[in-house]
Amino acid sequence: MVVSADPLSSERAEMNILEINQELRSQLAESNQQFRDLKEKFLITQATAYSLANQLKKYKCEEYKDIIDSVLRDELQSMEKLAEKLRQAEELRQYKALVHSQAKELTQLREKLREGRDASRWLNKHLKTLLTPDDPDKSQGQDLREQLAEGHRLAEHLVHKLSPENDEDEDEDEDDKDEEVEKVQESPAPREVQKTEEKEVPQDSLEECAVTCSNSHNPSNSNQPHRSTKITFKEHEVDSALVVESEHPHDEEEEALNIPPENQNDHEEEEGKAPVPPRHHDKSNSYRHREVSFLALDEQKVCSAQDVARDYSNPKWDETSLGFLEKQSDLEEVKGQETVAPRLSRGPLRVDKHEIPQESLDGCCLTPSILPDLTPSYHPYWSTLYSFEDKQVSLALVDKIKKDQEEIEDQSPPCPRLSQELPEVKEQEVPEDSVNEVYLTPSVHHDVSDCHQPYSSTLSSLEDQLACSALDVASPTEAACPQGTWSGDLSHHQSEVQVSQAQLEPSTLVPSCLRLQLDQGFHCGNGLAQRGLSSTTCSFSANADSGNQWPFQELVLEPSLGMKNPPQLEDDALEGSASNTQGRQVTGRIRASLVLILKTIRRRLPFSKWRLAFRFAGPHAESAEIPNTAGRTQRMAG
């Protein structure tokens, strides 16, 4: 007997199965959630255990050593697993990138194959039409050639599409085209730059030419001479050379001055090599005479030189350099002779034009003044000698005296005379009894006569680490020179100068219009007394207004006292002359003019302040003693 299933029971069974599935799914979800929670707790616990194990290991707990090792071991294993996972993830990332690139290449290859199929299909069709001609006339001739050309083109296109280097070639072709375009665009620019440079070069050259022309020619209409100075310092020796150059728009020749006094042997070698100009040489009226005043220093001594040469009739300016370097032994030999033959040394000196040394020069600003109460019939010849110590730099500044002079027919052979204007004189009054120290200020005589004007010159030479500078002043006389011997005798003595505080100040400048005209040939009649130059002595003589002669006064330079208002140099000239004396009657006269023009607009030459003091021994003193640096004394007659 067969029992049939009840449909209600079957429905109940299906409902039970569905409920069971739902319950199981809910339980599975709960289990997954619990697993995740437990996993989180495990990770937290593992981290806590790892930290505790590290602390225990730090405190060296032997009891929990096994636990610590196990925990740390587990931690190391977990770290290794994590590192491995990271490495695998990185590799998967790389592989994924590689797969993408390969997939891209496959896509491109599929595209090429499709194009290749199309090209091959067109080629096949073309060949079929070519091989199965309908008209034999058309198969030959122009139509055949066109079909063959078309087939050749299709075959090339197919090969080009199927070649794997197609993309690379296309890229290269595009790059080449881009480069060509860039070159075409950039090519005009360099040409334009070259053209502009070619245009600029002549302009620069023209500017340079203009600069050189402006430097070589005198910009002013007054024909003011240029000056150039160069100061060289070598070890403990200082050579200071002031070279004044007078330029003309047509200047062609220039000679500079060089004074390197190192020792006597060097001077003798220079004398043997360099030509020495003659002592007595009559120069034509077309040339101005030249004068150079040198201050020679030997071993830690300062040498100051001033040179000038100017020619008014010739467009070329001749510049000569004369050097006077003399030792004490030579001076003693020269004193007994009738004429003084100072040594001459010549040497080139590189002089940079339009340059004024702005560094501090330890020098002196010495301004001569004529002794007060001088009679108009007699003016003394006097010169000063400066000695410097402690490696100080000295500069000889010469006061300008202009003179108007006519030739005297009754006396010895005439010589070219240099007539110049003489500025007015402002003399200082010096009390005889109360004043022991006075400031020397520049002063010049009032009137100028046509009679002979004597000059004096001093060549200063130093020894035992002394530096000297010579100050030469020419005093004109207002009356005719007396016939016979001179009433005043010129003796030689030496004054000591010590420089302890010589500083330059830009406010102190050399007095304007400084010129020196020096004539060593003392010619004043038949009974002219012969006077020998000495590089270490200087003398002073003067006549008072009452007719009595003043005694020789001693000139002392006090370095500790500074001149409050030193003179200033402007756009004028410093002229001087250096000449040689002859025998008893001077037959020739060498005149030289030293021109020093300093333009205050462009440059200034600073000098230190000096204070000059006179020590008067009294109006009726027979003689005065002046000690020199070595402790020796010399007497000068009153």
UniProtKB/Swiss-Prot annotation:
**Protein name per its UniProtKB record:** NBPF family member NBPF4
Q: Which organism is it from?
A: Homo sapiens
Q: Name the UniProt key words of this record, in alphabetical order.
A: Coiled coil, Cytoplasm, Repeat
**What InterPro entries does this protein map onto?**
NBPF (IPR055306), Olduvai_dom (IPR010630)
- Per the similarity annotation, which family is this? Belongs to the NBPF family.
UniProt subcellular location: Cytoplasm
Q: Where is the composition biased (Basic and acidic residues)?
A: 192-202, 232-251, 264-273
Q: Where is the Olduvai domain?
A: 174-261, 326-399, 400-503
Q: Where is this region: Disordered?
A: 157-285, 562-584
**Where does it sit, as one GO cellular component term?**
cytoplasm
Superkingdom assignment? Eukaryota
Query: What sections of the sequence does the record tag as coiled-coil?
Result: 10-43, 69-115
Q: In which tissues is it expressed?
A: Expressed in testis.
**Additional remark text:** Encoded by one of the numerous copies of NBPF genes clustered in the p36, p12 and q21 region of the chromosome 1.
Question: What residue range is the signal peptide?
Answer: none
Q: Name the residue ranges with Low complexity bias.
A: 214-226
Ranges of Acidic residues compositional bias?
Answer: 165-179
